[in-house]
Swiss-Prot record:
Pathway: Lipid metabolism; fatty acid biosynthesis. Contributes to cuticular wax and suberin biosynthesis. Negatively regulates the stomatal development in elevated CO(2) conditions. It comes from the Eukaryota. It catalyses: a very-long-chain acyl-CoA + malonyl-CoA + H(+) = a very-long-chain 3-oxoacyl-CoA + CO2 + CoA. Residues 52-341 form the FAE domain. This is 3-ketoacyl-CoA synthase 13. It is a single-pass membrane protein. The active site is at C196, H275, H359, H363, H392, N396. The keyword NAD does not apply. It is found in: Membrane. One of its GO terms (molecular function) is fatty acid elongase activity. The chain crosses the membrane at residues 32-52.
Length: 466
């Protein structure tokens, strides 16, 4: 394992001091500065700085990221979706009418993407097609990432893949090892069943692994597989995912190497994770199970928005003290004094997060969820633009939606040095996770569209979503 640059400097300092001791060049004539106490003092100072450099938290940099953009042949318009549903001969007329209403109010446009096997009549989902979808998305995102960064796959020491519903054997992380012929000591992780918030969980895992592995690159792949996830029954609680979820995936390059700071786009400042799974209502609000006829699907509770709001409140309680300015903290203390100490009836305290965040990347889970977050946090239509436009252009791409949203912000040339970005993810369990990044440099126009999935369409956005 390589020695970090800061550690190397401290070790070099100690070696120089030892050499000086041996040469007796630190001799002073005054009794107070006699050689022995001077040597001991300098040695203690060196030990202190060495201990500080080895125990302090090393920065984690986001070198770059890339989102997969499928080919036009995989685009699925509303009309194509309805034709597919009818051609499958699985759904009743009432079910098709219900999905029609959901899709028309979903906020999705006609340029989202579907697996190729779902565009045939009838659809032909299979394990082979599921693997094909994952290979296209994962390798497409990774190839773009390696091209953008100039980093070879074998230089990466840590790979983390998160895909909630598709868990083949060998794993998706092993598929990457095989494709890129990675080194035998590469550390790989495969996260499943973590829902749409798994991308944030992967960032947290990568951050902790980078603390234990200096001078290392970590790559995160966030995706979901649609081929085997389509619900083929008529239970209304399980039909909404059919209408909202689409093909997508992202690859993210993280580094703890000090020399990467200059070229990296962002530095990680905070991760706050909230898990409300101890509550049955939260645990079962988004659950994969069988319907009354034994058909597997993901059932969404009518309480989903309420559960998400409660989880968000808990998450913000932990995040607020880390990011809010002093003025907002004082207002919060005043609210607590009035409501708790004096039992006064006061309006709920809602922090102004626009004071500490420039860009908002809220998980594009659905129109209702985005509306609730916008209203609950007092955000503007402009603040929610990246999320709503991502939902319109790409649909709900699960854990990778946060990166399509950040790609939108970059494509609009809005990222300036020092800006803070808030990525907010929701997922089954129920989980609510926040990631805060600080932009290390301004993203110029000639770089913002390179390998960006918005490159061919950002000029059309924003659009009005009815």
């Amino acid at each position: 394992m390589f020695i970090a640059m800061a550690d190397f400097k401290i070790l070099l300092l100690i070696l120089i001091l030892i050499s000086l001791f041996e040469l007796d060049l630190l001799h002073f004539h005054h009794d107070f500065f006699s050689p022995f106490p001077v040597k001991i003092g300098l040695l203690l100072i060196s030990i202190f700085f060495y201990a500080y450099s080895t125990t302090r938290s090393k920065p984690v940099y986001l070198v770059d990221f890339s989102c997969h953009q499928p080919t036009d042949s995989c685009k699925i318009s509303s009309e194509t979706f309805f034709n597919m549903a009818k051609g499958a001969q699985l759904y009743t007329d009432e079910t098709i009418q219900f999905m029609t209403r959901i899709l028309n109010r979903s906020g999705l446009g006609d340029d989202t993407y579907s697996p190729r096997c779902m565009l045939t009549s009838p659809p032909t989902p299979s394990m082979y097609e599921a693997r094909h979808e994952s290979e296209l998305v994962i390798f497409g995102a990774l190839n773009s990432l390696f091209k953008k960064t100039g980093i070879e796959p074998r230089e990466v020491g840590i790979f983390i893949v998160n895909c909630s519903l598709f868990n083949p054997n060998p794993s998706l992380s092993s598929m990457i090892v095989n494709r890129y012929k990675l080194k035998t000591d590469v550390k790989t992780y495969n996260l499943s069943g973590m829902g749409c918030s798994a991308g944030a969980i992967s960032v947290d895992l990568a951050t902790n692994l980078l603390k234990a592995n200096p001078n290392t690159y970590a790559v995160i792949v966030s995706t979901e597989n649609m081929t085997l996830s389509m619900y083929r029954g008529n239970d209304r609680s399980m039909l909404v995912p059919n209408c909202l979820f689409r093909v997508g995936g992202a690859a993210v390059m993280l580094s703890n190497r000090s020399q990467d700071r200059v070229r990296s786009k962002y530095e990680l400042t905070h991760i706050v994770r909230t898990h409300k799974g101890s509550s049955d209502k939260h645990y079962t609000c988004a659950e994969q199970k069988e319907d009354s006829k034994g058909i597997v699907g993901v059932a969404l509770s009518k309480e989903l928005t309420v559960v998400a709001g409660d989880s968000l409140k808990t998450n913000l309680t932990a995040l607020g003290p880390l990011v809010l300015p002093l003025s907002e903290k004082l207002r919060f203390i005043l609210f607590l004094v009035k409501s708790k100490l004096f039992r006064l009836k006061v309006s709920p305290y809602v922090p102004d997060f626009k004071l500490c965040f420039k860009h908002f990347c809220i998980h594009a889970g659905g129109r209702a969820l985005l509306d609730a977050v916008e209203k609950g946090l007092g955000l503007s239509e402009f603040d929610l633009e990246p999320s709503r436009m991502t939902l319109h252009r790409f649909g709900n791409t699960s854990s990778s939606s946060l990166w399509y949203e950040l790609a939108y912000v970059e494509a609009k040339c809005r990222v300036k040095r020092g800006d803070r970005v808030w990525q907010l993810a929701f997922g089954s369990g129920f989980k609510c996770n926040s990631i805060v990044w600080r932009a290390l440099r301004t993203i110029p126009a000639n770089e913002s569209l390179v390998g960006n999935p918005w490159g061919d369409s950002v000029h059309k956005y924003p659009v009005h979503v009815t």
